[in-house]
Amino acid sequence: MTDFKRIPPEQAHAMRNAGAVIVDIRDPHSFANGHISGSRHLDNHSLPDFIAAADLDHPLIVTCYHGHSSQSAAAYLVNQGFSEVYSLDGGFELWRHTYPSDVEHDEQQ
């Protein structure tokens, strides 16, 4: 894959269930208030360690608020060597409406 692909929540859900990693690039407060179950928060501080430890060939799904910022982040991750990157269309907002029972909240806020 030389570029990322945009995918709907249904495809992201199936891919996540098959082992794809989901990274959430929203601000820490928004992530703490609700995020896709099993997703990992990714920001400028955690990015270098994430890239260093990641399997660059493992499917990676990027989510943001509405599916716009995730496209830039997905393109960046492709440029960093990730071979299978996806941007979640509709972002977390569409996910939480599509799969409300598949949302986690951090205990400490």
From Swiss-Prot:
GO-annotated molecular function: thiosulfate-cyanide sulfurtransferase activity
Active-site residues annotated for this sequence: C64 (cysteine persulfide intermediate)
Any Pfam family the entry gives: Rhodanese
Entry's family note: Belongs to the GlpE family.
Residues in coiled coil: none
EC number: 2.8.1.1
Cellular compartments per GO CC: cytoplasm
Keyword terms of this UniProt record: Cytoplasm, Transferase
Biological role: Transferase that catalyzes the transfer of sulfur from thiosulfate to thiophilic acceptors such as cyanide or dithiols. May function in a CysM-independent thiosulfate assimilation pathway by catalyzing the conversion of thiosulfate to sulfite, which can then be used for L-cysteine biosynthesis.
Gene3D superfamilies according to UniProt: Rhodanese-like domain
UniProt GO BP: glycerol metabolic process
Localization of this protein: Cytoplasm
Reactions that this protein is recorded to catalyse: thiosulfate + hydrogen cyanide = thiocyanate + sulfite + 2 H(+); thiosulfate + [thioredoxin]-dithiol = [thioredoxin]-disulfide + hydrogen sulfide + sulfite + 2 H(+)
Occurrences of domain Rhodanese (ranges): 16-104
Xref: InterPro entries: GlpE_sulfurtransferase, Rhodanese-like_dom, Rhodanese-like_dom_sf, Thiosulf_sulfurTrfase
Stored HAMAP family: Thiosulf_sulfurtr (MF_01009)
Main location: cytoplasm
Keyword Cytoplasm attached: yes
Protein name, as recorded: Thiosulfate sulfurtransferase GlpE
Provenance organism: Stutzerimonas stutzeri (strain A1501)
